[in-house]
C-alpha cells in the first residue's frame, strides 16, 4: 500500500473498468466515508456491497446497493438488491457470484508495517482476498480512532515510512 492524495485516487478510480464495478465497503460503524465519497464522485455507475450499512450511503441513479444483511442505511431504498445468504457463506459469495473490483476499508494507523481493520473484520478479509485474486483495488482510509486489533484484522502494508499522523489518510493498493 502507498499513501495517495484524494486527487490521485479520484483519477485512478475514474479510469476503472468494468463500466459497472462492484465496490465492497466496510459497514457497521466502520464505513470509510471519505473514500466512499471519492468513489461516488469518480464513478458514474457502480454496485455497492455493504453489510449492515449505516444511513448516508449514496442515493442516486447509477448506484445499485447490494447486501445479504440489510442495515438502517439500506432499508426501504429503491433498487436495493437483497442477496439471501448466511453470514458464514458471504466469503464464498465474494469468491464466486459477487466478486469485488474494489474494496474500501477503514483501518488503524500503521504499526510496524501493518494496519488493522479494527472493529470491522467480519467479511472484509475474504473481500480483500477475492479482490486480490482478480487484480482489483484495496483502498484504505486510515482513522486514528480505529483500534488496532489482531488476527485476521491485520493487513501488511509494506513500508510505513512517510505515513504522516493525520486524522484521515488514504492508502491505495493495486
Language model feature labels by segment:
Residues 1-174:
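Conserved alpha/beta enzyme-core scaffold
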Amino acid at each position: 500500500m502507498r499513501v495517495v492524495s484524494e486527487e490521485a485516487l479520484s483519477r485512478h478510480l475514474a479510469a476503472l473498468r468494468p463500466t459497472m464495478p462492484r465496490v465492497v465497503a466496510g459497514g457497521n460503524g466502520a464505513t470509510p466515508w471519505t473514500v466512499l465519497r471519492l468513489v461516488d464522485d469518480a464513478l458514474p455507475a457502480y454496485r455497492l456491497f455493504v453489510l449492515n450499512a449505516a444511513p448516508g450511503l449514496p442515493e442516486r441513479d447509477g448506484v445499485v446497493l447490494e447486501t445479504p444483511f440489510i442495515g438502517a442505511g439500506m432499508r426501504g431504498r429503491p433498487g436495493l438488491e437483497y442477496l439471501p445468504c448466511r453470514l458464514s457463506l458471504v466469503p464464498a459469495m465474494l469468491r464466486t457470484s459477487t466478486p469485488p473490483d474494489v474494496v474500501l476499508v477503514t483501518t488503524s494507523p500503521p504499526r510496524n508495517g501493518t494496519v488493522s481493520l479494527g472493529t470491522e473484520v467480519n467479511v472484509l478479509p475474504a473481500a480483500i482476498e477475492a479482490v486480490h485474486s482478480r487484480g482489483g483495488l484495496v483502498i484504505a482510509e486510515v482513522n486514528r480512532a480505529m483500534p488496532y486489533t489482531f488476527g485476521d484484522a491485520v493487513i501488511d502494508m509494506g513500508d510505513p515510512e512517510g505515513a504522516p499522523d493525520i486524522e484521515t489518510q488514504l492508502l491505495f493498493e493495486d
